[in-house]
From Swiss-Prot:
Keywords: Activator, DNA-binding, Transcription, Transcription regulation. Pfam families: Arabinose_bd, HTH_18. One of its GO terms (biological process) is ornithine catabolic process. One of its GO terms (molecular function) is DNA-binding transcription factor activity. The keyword DNA-binding applies. This is Ornithine utilization regulator. Residues 241-338 form the HTH araC/xylS-type domain. Residues 258-279, 305-328 bind DNA. The keyword Transcription regulation applies. Probably activates the ArgJ gene that encodes ornithine acetyltransferase. Binds to its own promoter-operator region. Probably binds ornithine. It comes from the Bacteria.
């Protein structure tokens, strides 16, 4: 069984921590002050594999936000993480034939960056939408991480096409933060909140935009290195990703924990223990999948509520309504009718 993605695994590139340290210095916070506040040893940046753990990086981000007094620090950091900050993957993206090829390469190998997200590209009605869903529970770090991810995706896309993206839209899975107006300064458009997932949408014609530095030989070399990195890091598929995929493959007929464990070739006890080490439970993962599917059905289909309830494995509409209200604070009908 592959090792589950967890908070103590050294998967986050040191380059991200260095970018954070450079940024907080501009707010008058020294490197040592940040390490002291975060209770993280400076030596973590000297790791021979060039990576640090999620736990250490999250501690640094928590303390950075507190010391800098900048609520939008995630957005600011995301704008600073240019192509070169993403290492070998960044070079491959820069050398791709066009933006579409660059995105395809990134989606194939983004796990070399130690991201705590599942990413996918959805093409529909003349638009290209990049979607991001947490592959591990980030808790209080969710907003900072999502801001950083989406801001860097947008900034790099603009850099690759050589101009600010036009007719772009962006959405986030959490309620609007107090600094929500700052999002328009970054993306050039007001963000949408309380979405089923984080997303960045642009006209699909951008995917054909050629790259000035296209180099097939460089892309091939980078692909070989990315394959080697994936094998070394063993992060091709984290445990939460595998559980979610299993549940999404069986909407309306979700397995219980023991059934899921058998399909994942492990024991129920082992699955429960691994999920606990990630700060979650099987029921919480199932509820999260149900919630995301419910939001998707309500926003993208006209299915009656009783059919949505059945698709989500509820015996009747009343149980679905109670669960949905617990998840969102709203009734399904009210959510669907909201502008």
């Amino acid at each position: 069984m592959k090792q589950p993605l967890n908070f103590t695994a050294e998967l986050v590139p040191v380059a991200y921590a260095e970018a954070l340290l450079d940024l907080v210095a501009e707010y008058g916070v020294s490197r040592q002050a940040l390490f002291d506040a975060a209770r993280v040893r400076p030596e973590v940046l000297d790791s021979p594999n060039g990576r640090l753990s999620f736990l250490d990086f999250n501690q640094l981000t928590y303390s950075a936000q507190a010391l800098c007094g900048e609520p939008a620090l995630g957005l600011v950091l995301g704008q600073r993480l240019n192509v070169s900050a993403h290492g070998i993957l960044g070079y491959a993206v820069l050398s791709s034939a066009n933006l579409g090829k660059a995105i395809q390469f990134a989606l194939k190998y983004y796990r070399v960056l130690g991201l705590a997200y599942e990413l996918e590209l959805v093409l529909d009605d003349g638009r290209a939408e990049l979607r991001a869903v947490e592959s591990m529970p980030l808790g209080a770090a969710s907003v900072f991480a999502a801001e950083g991810l989406m801001a860097t995706l947008y900034s790099i896309a603009c850099f690759l096409v050589g101009e600010p993206l036009q007719d772009v839209r962006v959405g986030f899975a959490y309620p609007p933060p107090a600094h929500a107006r700052r999002y328009a300064e970054v993306f050039g458009v007001a963000a949408e909140f309380e979405q089923p997932w984080h997303w960045l949408s642009m006209p699909s014609e951008y995917l054909e935009r050629p790259m000035a530095l296209a180099n097939p030989a460089t892309v091939q070399m980078c692909e070989q290195q990315c394959e080697a990195l994936l094998a070394t890091l063993d992060v091709q598929e984290g445990l939460l990703t595998r559980v979610r995929r299993l549940l999404l493959a069986r909407p309306g007929d979700f397995p219980d924990l023991e059934q899921a464990a058998r399909e994942l070739h492990t024991s129920g006890r082992s699955l429960r223990r691994h999920l606990s080490s990630l700060g979650t439970t099987y029921q919480q993962v199932l509820d999260d999948v149900r919630k995301r599917l419910a939001l998707q059905y309500l926003t993208t289909t006209q299915l009656p509520l009783y059919e949505i309830a059945l698709l989500l494995g509820f015996n009747d509409s009343s149980n679905f309504r109670r669960a949905f209200r617990k998840w969102t604070g709203k009734l399904p009908s009210d959510y669907r009718e909201a502008p």
